[in-house]
Design a protein with these regions (language model features):
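Catalytic cores of alpha/beta
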Residues: 62-91, 173-201
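Conserved anion-binding
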Residues: 3-16, 85, 89-164
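Alpha-helical segments flanking ligand/cofactor-binding loops in enzyme cores
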Residues: 29, 59, 82-85, 106, ...
Length: 201
């Protein structure tokens, strides 16, 4: 979401955005009507500014559609986490803080529980990217998972940035390797899915 509207970025580039006509609330309702149980929402304004910016919109989505909402973007404090949960989010996706302040995210895992806290690990060329994909770290997703598992990590959303928004297929090899290595972690594949064949595979 940017400025209250549904958008799709190409490879995380804010300058390359496609804006969709449907409002986020209407989109959430449409997904719910199709039987979707859980939707993924990123507050891109929040990701850029380091604090949630679309809380009222989150509240309207939570009230207006009978789906679980996983919410990310700008979640860098305990107060921000409590705010999105208060406004209706079921799950919190934390990426930048988890990668850059690992002890803090470990505390949040223990505080809120691994069933609500989701590690958002966005990768580019094998390394984790943070701060709205504007900065790449010398850190792998495997290193992050290994660190957080003892604290209750059970859910990971992994996006291959080079595939994101391109609609040309995800990084099957990356996700297959991660799932086989960490069988007790639930992975959500993100980035590049452009067809039913991609989903089935």
């Amino acid at each position: 979401i940017i400025e209250g509207r549904c958008v799709r970025l190409s490879q995380g580039d804010y300058a390359q955005r496609k804006v969709y006509d449907a409002s986020p609330v209407d989109m959430a309702k449409r997904y719910a009507d199709c039987g979707v149980k859980r939707i993924h929402v990123v507050d891109l304004d929040g990701a850029k500014s380091s604090s949630p910016k679309n809380l009222k919109l989150l509240e309207r989505m939570a009230v207006g559609a009978s789906v679980e909402i996983e919410w990310g973007g700008g979640l860098k404090s305990e107060e921000a986490l409590r705010a999105i949960f208060d406004y209706g989010a079921t799950y919190a996706i934390v990426g930048s803080v988890a990668a850059q302040k690992q002890e803090l995210f470990a505390e949040w895992l223990e505080m809120f529980g691994g069933e609500r806290m989701v590690l958002g690990a966005d990768v580019r060329n094998g390394k984790v990217s943070v701060n709205g994909w504007l900065e790449d770290l010398a850190l792998s997703i495997e290193e992050l998972i290994e660190f957080f598992k003892p604290y209750g990590l059970s859910q990971v959303i992994c996006t291959d940035i080079t595939k994101d928004g391109m609609l040309k297929g995800p990084s099957f090899e990356l996700y297959t390797d991660l799932q086989s290595r960490y069988e007790d972690v639930d992975f959500t594949v993100s980035g590049g899915i452009g067809s039913m064949a991609d989903i089935e595979k």
